[in-house]
Amino acid sequence: GKEILLITNQGNDGDILVFDRKTGKGIRKINRKGQGGEEYSYPYYITLDEDKKEMFVADYATRKILVYDLSGNFKRSFKYTDTSYYNDLFDYDRDHLITYKNYPALQENDKACHILISKQDGSVAREIRTPFKELETPIVTKDEFIVSPEFHQTYPDHTDWLLVNTSSDTIYRYSADGSISPSVVRT
């Protein structure tokens, strides 16, 4: 945000640190790690809606998003839409978050895509599909071992978004008007 900075170490201790972006001073430490309905167990992604003074915590283990105010008070939660996991969670606009709906390594399929989800109830407002010829995943399997490198699929770019799909040879630009256009193309 312009005034607030949120930091976490992706779940190890459950701490979410709130800083004043201008001064760099710590404002508070929030920890809602636990097994209760208003707690997270593995806070993997956090995004801030500074206008509404809310933070959205994507709990990878329970596959839900919990919403807190900036003092750490629970406001609401909602589950992911299906068996997917959300990678890269960002504040998109007043009413939506943008994320990449991903599936476990051995279940990766053509249902994976970028989505806009409601900040109120988690419902999918829009699926954003990028074209590709053949489904390819960066997963290597050998005997019982599976290696899946971590990479990011969603990048903010001024007022637009850069969207990456490992099956595509193109990085796409998604604009606020809902249009998709090639940004970087492998030739």
Residue ranges with predicted function:
Residues 7-11, 57-60, 99-102, 163-166:
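Conserved beta-strand positions in repeat-built beta-propeller and related beta-rich domains
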Residues 58-113, 126-140:
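Asp-box/WD-like beta-propeller blade repeats and closely related beta-sheet repeat scaffolds
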Residues 28-40, 79-83, 125-147, 181-187:
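Surface-exposed loop and turn segments in beta-propeller and other repeat-based domains
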Residues 2, 48-52, 91-94, 156-157:
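Residue-level detector of Asp-centered blade-edge/turn motifs that repeat once per structural unit
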Residues 41-46, 83-92, 149-151:
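Repeated scaffold domains used in trafficking and secretory/extracellular systems
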Residues 116-180:
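Loop-centered beta-sheet repeat module
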Residues 25-60, 82:
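Blade-loop segments of beta-propeller domains
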Residues 1-15:
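Beta-strand-rich domains and repeat architectures in extracellular enzymes and scaffolds
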